Amino acid sequence: NYYNSIKWMATASDDLYVPDYIDMLRVAFTFKFSRGKFSDLVALLSGRNFETRSYEDSIAESSYAKLSEGLEAFVNQTNYQRFVMIIKSTGLVSKKLISSQNSLNFAYALYLKLREDGMGEAESQGYVKRWMVMSMFIGRYSGSAESHIDEDIKQINEKGIKAYLKQMEQA
């Protein structure tokens, strides 16, 4: 099933963003579940109900389906190529200029989220560019990346990208 979705990558020549399977899982998980800690992914795929602290087959099944949707969005050729174009338009045209793979991962998760939320292409591109540059300048994902990813995606969901990005830029 995934082969048809990823076969275009075999001929892709861009080396700016070359994600491994961990990167793919991180982006898909952050985008679809609005969480950043892999321990939460493992718990959800096991059927963990965080409210009742029990395990339910229905949660495991829906979590697998949701993760699959996230992976499909990740490997979608149009999504991927537009994202790489956005990053290049910031001036980051070489892998050597990017200090943190997790800055790329979060920026891609943010792009997918904003598009799924119905934000227009131009507006979402603007936010993704600003987020990418800000996160690299301050080294946002260099240390405890999982905690920052988790915090950021939750704050974006709570406050909205406009307000949270402004808060981060003013901090």
Can you name each region flagged by the protein language model?
Residues N1-A171:
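Flexible coil/loop and intrinsically disordered segments
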